[in-house]
Amino acid sequence: MSPIRAALFLGATALPAATGAQTAPVTVKPIVYTQRTLANGLRVFAIRDTSTPNVSVQVWYDVGSKDDPKNRSGFAHMFEHLMFKATRNLVPEQVDRLTEDVGGYNNASTNDDYTNYFEVVPANHLQRLLFAEADRMASLVVEPVSFASERDVVKEELRQRVLASPYGKLYSIYYPQLSYGVHPYARPGIGSLNDLQAASIDDVRAFHATYYRPDNAILVVSGNFNPMQLDRWIDGYFAPIAKPNRPIPRVTVAEPARTQAVARTVYEPNTPLPAVLVSYHVPPDRDADTPALTVLQAILATGESSRLYQSLVYRDQVAQSAAAFLDTKQSTGNLVAYAIVAGGKTVQQGETALKREIARLRTEPVTAAELAEAKNEILTQAIRQRETAEGKAFVLATSTIVDGDPDASQKQLEAVGRVTAADVRRVAAKYLGDRQSATIRYLPVESRPAGSASDAVPIAATVRVADLRAPADIPVVTPAPVGRRVMPPQPAAPIAAVLPQPVETRLVNGLRVVTVERHDLPIVTASLVASGGAATDPAGRAGASGLTSALLTKGTATRSATEIARAIESLGGSIESGSSRDGASIDVTVKSDQIAPAMAILADVAVHPAFKPDEIERARAQSIDAVNVEFKDPAQLARLVAARAVFGSAPYGAPAEGTPESLKAITRDDVQRSYRATWTPASATLLMVGDITPTAARALAERHFGGWRAIGPAGAAPVVAAAAEPRVVLVDMPDAGQAGVVVARPAITRTDARFYPLAVANTTLGGGFSSRLNQEIRIKRGLSYGAASSLSARRQGGVIEARTQTKNPTAPDVVAIIVEEMRKLGTAPAPAAELDTRKAVLVGGFGRAIETTAGIADILGDYLVQSVPLSELSRYTGAVQGVDPRAVQAAAAELLDPARASIVVVGDARQFADALRRRYPKLEVIPASSLNLDSPTLK
């Protein structure tokens, strides 16, 4: 199953509860929907849910990257971008105005088999979205200026996601190209720079006329709506779209079975650690073997009790990370296993270990415990997907397009419940033989032996690709004259959201217990939160809080790390521990029938961590490998350097994850001190969100945490020094595929009275697709795939940063645009209409977050570590909406002034250093190889 399919796997069957369950197992009801087909062939699905104030509108077209024309790889994906431009009645980017500017959002994606367009908006805007989707299906306008600009944006997306990202070429280029010899799945969906440049406007018009038609699409509406009114709107907007009198081209070629193993070795720049990827052909998603393969994948790679994690990462430590996914499609797909090799290990060791675990599936039966755990994990994934209207729509649409049956996911889940150990071994033997493998070894270019070269991994000459045959007499659509343009309908009366209400109590030992009831789905998120975090790390020990948090789930006085993972995952649940700048948390999500045994595990890891020396060394090695990977990513490294530039020697300046040097310096005593200072009942809060009552939550808290006693005083809040003087820093990363750009400056605490005006100012600057930065950098100039800004308001003063990635030569231009947009916000008042849309972005994002148990827990957890009262949950929307233009300008003038900002660029200095120095004579150039993030000077 593909990554998206794995996330959307859904059904109605209750799977057997794990041993020790306290209540009857939960059941998952099937998605209730209506279906009809219009005369023009458009299939319409409606899923009504009156518990939400939102609605999701989705149009999925049965055309994807496999349908890219000859010499036009990446075409379906580029066309996806163009669908957000003009139509006969909509101006460019008006879909964003209709969604983001009212508190919703929109997006789209291109898969090998389909292209989907999806929006979530307040339900009173449903009619407007139906109007817009029908208009771009029927009357897309393609003109030279927007076509050229969006083509440049797609090129930047390719550079950002593939060329500049460590391992980007492994997953996006080499994997598909080696996996297929005949089927057009071989071509990367992102395309190539040459093919993108060769595309023409006539190609675009022909593609739209060929595939973007009602009989090649489905419409899914999910959320709060009146069914009769919905039908009238659909009949009014979509039914008049004509069905073309010509067949739809289909890819019918079949990929032959692989009977001889293939392997390639490649060397790439900016590769922090070697990697290996092995793929095996599997049948189409609709095949009867897919449920057994889904269980196999879960046993192999889901959670820390999985075989790959236990063998490669935990026990033998040959991999920094290891995973597998089931990439099923309409036609032949793949099961893919991969590993990022640990520091000091070889790619050969990683490959041997991966293939050893695959072989075990063929030769040894899986255990009953592994089988039950995998099924429970799949069920929990299904429940979590149903938390939102959008998630339910994705399930239905994916099943319809990929499998040809809207009930396919439900049927597959029922079949998962019937999978046996013999089934798992059978499909492993059938599909995962040694001779059926395709292996890619991906190594740093520095490790290439003298005189050798990378193996070629081209698209095979035998791959069959069709020419794009333009239909005759394609109409050229032009924008309607202003006076004749049909305007979107007005929104209806808004539907009020029901805000969750936290209920608080406190145990005798001081532990605060907060419950938020949500009984619509049988799921609970429990989060134990405490103040502390990376800001409390001692000098020279950056990463201590993060390492301590990671170790909480790696062993207690009575359970080993493996036993903890198996215990929680056997319940179908997950457990994660981590830290932020200001706090730490342990989070459990589980079906509500398993909350009692899950709470016992949560309490054990919080109260009785062992911090065994061997676990510390294992976690240390994994953390060092992880930061080494991060240091090879231009965008990530730019943010780390910016933190040092802004805060200097203050605690917020040090990397929260640590550096290789600081992580090596951390001792067991440091870990124990960090734990004692952070985790005390009086300074911690237990959040319980979901299908549980306050009475039941308190009883569980008393049972499992009532005996918890502090073993040391709570840590004091760190003293944060004044921000450092602004700097302009260029980190030279030779051969970087893109430049990462960050402009950052100090911000305020979360409790500061200026928080809401600054939040609106930040969102105006860089929050969302319609923000000023994205308008100037992406939409108008095509210099980046996207530009954004963020406000991190913390307990001791935070940071505001504007950031993007761009091709190396344009980095100085992008810096200039960011600086100018920051300046303008403080020198002239923003129009009230613009601010209204930016407020809607904040309010809409908040509303979507509180639709899920994890989202509510995250918001409340942030409030707790930032000393914000939980009543903020109820006042957030009003506080945002009450901000006026004068307050925004005042906040921007004081807190966005670029004169107090540091500028950081990470990229290939040869291509832009001189231009940047002309603008900033005090430019500091630091080679990436000698960058020292442990030092405030960076040297």
What are these regions (language model features)?
Residues 5-17:
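Bacterial N-terminal signal peptides
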Residues 18-45, 226-268, 275, 310, ...:
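Proteolytic maturation boundary segments
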Residues 45-47, 52-78, 92-137, 166-194, ...:
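M16 family metallopeptidases and their MPP-like homologs
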Residues 75-83, 296, 547-548, 761:
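Active-site His/Glu-centered metal-binding helix of metallohydrolases
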Residues 135-144, 237-245, 356-366, 604-611, ...:
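A common structural junction motif
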Residues 155-161, 253-267, 376-385, 590, ...:
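Short, conserved secondary-structure transition motifs
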Residues 208, 576, 675:
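Conserved, carboxylate-rich catalytic/transport cores that coordinate ions
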